[in-house]
Regions:
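Structural motif
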Residues: 239-253, 304-310
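Beta-propeller blade termini
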Residues: 213-227, 280-288
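Surface-exposed loop/turn elements that mediate protein-protein interactions on large endomembrane-trafficking
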Residues: 253-273, 312-320
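Bacterial N-terminal signal peptides
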Residues: 7-15
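Bacterial signal peptide processing site
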Residues: 19-21
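Acidic/hydrophobic-patterned starts of short beta strands in beta-sheet-rich repeat architectures
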Residues: 222-234, 290-300
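Repeat-based blade/solenoid architectures
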Residues: 199-216, 270-282, 327-333
Length: 333
């Protein structure tokens, strides 16, 4: 069944492939200019003189995962890393800047590149990169793209987005999209989970468990009978890039209700004094490597920078499969 797309704004650039867009009965067929088969398929065309330079720049060869937010009709998406199984590999600064010229070479992240958009683990639209830049607010320099988004109508209110290149994710089908909102029982369950973990890790009790909860999400993983929850609790700290107060810690908990009541499925306790500030916030889930198992993407807030972390399932339990950290204490672990 053909899906009806909602064009959030006028499309200003042509897609790299042929596509149809319809408004009020008017059908526009967008066709690309004629290129060689290598270019039209999205493959890199490398002359012999440039082959060695590309290799020396460390241009990414694996699929790249992007994450970002939509504001109105446009979105800004930042590179998280290269997909490496259920983990991710950071794109190094050396892979972005040419030592010879000082210019940035972004490899697969180029103007006019087409990206498949995801939210809540399902495909919801696309975006064509109109601008490419570098974001220096993270631990390492990160390629960033911006452009106009096209979303399915039921996802018209989505703000948080994850993206993969059309060449990687173009074959993934559209699935029904549902936005999940946490309810009273789930909020109470998150407090119970935190209350269970705090004494087990020897953490100081906050003055109020309720007030220490700074973030909570409900989400539905494929194949699970009930929604899962993820929540972040903070003591003597805030979910921004700012140095913490003495005695600060963060506690991230996830719970599932497969048995009828919520139980801990993953927890991450981090004492800022010994490990450095690293406050996790749930962003979204997606099967980024297409193996049929979902991964979870987290945004991390440090004292001065942002970074990402990822969770994956291993032997039916969640593990931290990736962390790109600014903090030297975490790098050495």
């Amino acid at each position: 069944m053909q899906r009806e797309h909602l064009a959030i704004a006028v499309i200003l650039t042509l897609a790299t492939g042929c596509d149809n867009v319809a408004w009020e009965g008017l059908e526009l067929r967008l066709k690309p200019p004629t290129f060689s088969s290598a270019v039209s398929s999205g493959q890199s065309v490398i002359t012999p003189d440039l082959a060695d330079e590309e290799q020396s720049l460390g241009i990414p060869k694996r699929p790249i995962l992007l994450s970002g937010k939509r504001t109105g009709s446009t979105a800004k998406l930042t590179a998280v890393g290269e997909v490496n199984g259920n983990s991710l590999t950071v794109i190094s600064d050396q892979g972005l800047r040419s030592e010879a010229t000082g210019d940035f070479s972004l490899g697969l992240i180029t103007q006019s590149s087409e990206w498949v958009l995801f939210s809540e683990g399902v495909r919801i639209g696309r975006m064509i990169a109109q601008e490419v830049s570098i974001d220096d607010s993270f631990c390492t320099l990160r390629p960033t793209i911006s452009g106009i988004v096209e979303l399915v109508s039921e996802a018209s209110d989505v703000e948080q987005l994850i993206a993969l290149l059309i060449d990687v994710a173009g074959s993934r089908s559209f699935q029904p999209y549902t936005a999940y909102r946490h309810n009273y029982n789930q909020r109470v369950a998150s407090l119970a989970l935190a209350s269970e973990v705090i004494p087990s890790v020897g953490a100081e009790w906050p003055p109020s468990i309720l007030d220490s909860r700074t973030d909570i999400h409900a989400f539905q993983l494929p194949g699970e009978p009930r929604q899962a929850i993820a929540a972040t609790f903070l003591h003597q700290d805030r979910m921004i890039t700012l140095p913490p107060e003495p005695g600060a810690y963060s506690l991230f908990v996830m719970g599932d209700a497969t048995s009828g009541t919520y139980e801990i499925s993953y927890m991450w306790y981090r004492l800022a004094e010994s490990q450095g500030k690293g406050v996790p916030r749930y962003l979204d889930h997606i099967d980024w490597n297409g193996d049929g198992s979902e991964e979870i993407l987290l945004e991390m807030f440090g004292s001065e920078d942002l970074w990402f972390a990822g969770l994956a399932r291993q032997d039916s339990r969640w593990i931290r499969s990736f962390e790109d950290s600014c903090n030297s204490a975490t790098r050495e672990k």
